[in-house]
Amino acid sequence: MARKKEFEYEEKLDIAMHLFWEQGYHVTSLSDLESHMKINRSSIYPTYGDKKELLLKCLDRYQKSKLSEYRSFLSDGSDNALEDLVKLLNLAIQQSIIENRVCLAVKMIFEIALVDEEIRHMLLANEKEIQKVYQAVLERGIQQHLVKKGLDAKTAAAFFASSSTTMLKNYVLYRNRTETASMIRMLVNFISR
């Protein structure tokens, strides 16, 4: 029985996550959550906490999944870090292209992180982990003599992580895959030898 309950817990959490993703945090009401998750308020609170706690659980689940995708670039042992940078930047925007929606973390950064410190800290911690992935790939590029000599990998990693959000914005507005791919190549060329 515990196995079934755990499955339902995760399944319902995914439903809530997609609802926050679709509607945003502020627009999503407890009534919306009850209706979509098919559980009542008296079950939501003891299981998931209040609406904000539920969002935190959803963000945690989402960020762990995305971070796992990013970290896969650290274990593949590629001999071309620049190609991995292109793949990393593509990963950051592919969801918008394929699923026609912006990254949940990016959405929450702009919707709620300015006014909620707890959520901002959670999103910031995740961003720092993503930057570590970029930094490791950039350092590999330096070792492979593919990246300009003297590049500050830590600052460049922060720049690449921020740039992926900017390119995501560009794609959402213009819906031009070719231009987005060109921007990614241009960004990588800026640091190439």
PLM features: residue spans?
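Hydrophobic alpha-helical connector segments
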Residues: 57, 71-100, 153-160
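Amphipathic alpha-helical packing segments from all-alpha helical-bundle domains
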Residues: 98, 117-143, 155
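Generic hydrophobic, amphipathic alpha-helix propensity
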Residues: 8-19, 33, 58-62, 66, ...
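Amphipathic alpha-helical segments used for helix-helix packing
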Residues: 84, 97-118
